[in-house]
């Protein structure tokens, strides 16, 4: 069984006109028994980066993106630059289809379609690496 250590983080409210809406983090930290702290979606899907994208551009498209779904958001405002308890910065990059993909330390991040929550199956496979938070 994976040891889960979810960070509790209070996020500032985003003021839109006179209404306030809480910003949900695009990613959390959880502790995997084998890899230690890794970056994951709020549903505990491990997040990966691909070394072919060392130029900070999107290269995983089409069939690649079906196997490695990108973590996307509706707007840049949905992504805080920093998340409590996670060293590094978040941002977004525009995908070729126009959607905004979440980045971590300027690298686009992805899940792996064949993994269940809390699984890490593809670290160091074909240039894909789980985002380790050490």
Residue ranges and their predicted role:
Residues 7-15:
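Bacterial N-terminal signal peptides
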Residues 16-20:
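Hydrophobic membrane-targeting alpha-helices
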Residues 21-134:
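Compact beta-sheet-dominated domain cores in extracellular/mature segments
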